[in-house]
Amino acid sequence: MDHVVVAGAGISGLAACLVLSHVAARMTLVERLERPSEVGAALALQANGMVVLDRLGLLRTVQAAGVRIERMNIRNVSSRTLLTATVPDFGAGLDHAVAVRRTDLHTILLAAVAGRHCVRTRFGCTVVGADPTGTVTIRCSSGGQETLSADLVVGADGVSSAIRETGGFNSRVSAGHSYARTVVQSDVTPWLEEYWTRLGSFGHAPLGHGLAYFWVAAQAPPAADAVARRDLPALIDVWNRTLPAAAGLLTKVSSFDDLLINTVRRVDCRHWFSGRLVLIGDAAHAMAPNLGQGANGALVDAVVLAEQLVSGVTAEEAVQRYDRIRRPAVRRVQDVAGVLQSLCALGSPLAHVRDAALAVSTLVPQLGQNASRRALLPDVRAVRSAMVFDHTSC
């Protein structure tokens, strides 16, 4: 394949560049920001995302930047354990998750892309139109508008994807819950801890060096009102009356400006391709964060797409095969994440029914681990066996 254009220099776009550099002779990476950066606080890399980084030769670097996570607990508002899950062991360094700052992961991926001589970066350029024939129109901050032609255009430009919105995709975007997230100076448990309350979820994970990542739901009216007023003391008070542990971390936030506030959106597309245009990551399948599969799924998308492109079929057939393989599987993940997002915010008496049902899993701890293993195993196997990495990168 001669030329591939990737729109978006976030985690999914950078990963796509790295993987597709084993397929394309030359690539163009388009990003609207003049200095690309990753929006967000932190994430947990799971086995399916980590195996992609391993195949790219970046896993050890990422592991060194993050913290090893071996289990997660879910508790109710009374701190009663609802579910404990040990991270499943897939061998070869994939027996844990890694909590890492998004900026650190982004920096590592960006440096790796800079080492690919065939990738031309067009930072400060906004996609204003895309056509299924493989043409993309961009407008750059330096002035002027131009059209790029490619054998394949990859839309990795997030939930508000310009490729998706202008490229003839039949899609639906629906709003979900809102969250406040940040990183603070604090010591927390060495595992991922999440609480389910009537306000929604609160959770935290260690990042090392005395830092912790945490999030609080901001969807329920008392919290939403405080966020709308940008009133940090009021948000602390709301959570203190519900879950003092959450308020304890919120008090370590210096100002409201240190919080990242976002409303999670779900993206559903009838297909992830339109001619020579194809979507990956949030552009294709943004979802609730409750399974932590956003970035992990995007990494797998890139490999599955590239694997079809090296199979000897046309670009059009390759993206259709990618769609048939990935879209149904990811739809199931989206659905489960959405259900969990609703379950975690139940109030009485439904919360008591939920807690009683989940209590069964605490009697058989392997249930949570086995479910996680079954969910991730197909991705891990697909990436490990991918032949695209046998091709020399450009």
Identify the function of each model-found stretch:
Residues D2, A64, L291, E307-C394:
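C-terminal helical "tail/cap" subdomain of flavin- and related membrane-associated enzymes
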Residues A226-D258, A315, D323-R324, P365:
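Flavin-binding catalytic cores
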Residues S21-A41:
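Glycine-rich FAD pyrophosphate-binding loop
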Residues S12, R35, S160:
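Conserved Rossmann-like nucleotide-cofactor binding loop
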Residues L192-A224, I236-L243:
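Active-site substrate-recognition segment that forms the wall
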Residues M1-V4, S21, Q46-G167, R172-Q185, ...:
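Conserved N-terminal helical subregion
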Residues V5-H22, V30, G155, D258-A345:
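Conserved mid-domain beta->alpha element of the FAD-binding
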Residues V5, T28, R120, Y213-W215:
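A structural signal for isolated positions on well-ordered beta-strands in alpha/beta enzyme cores
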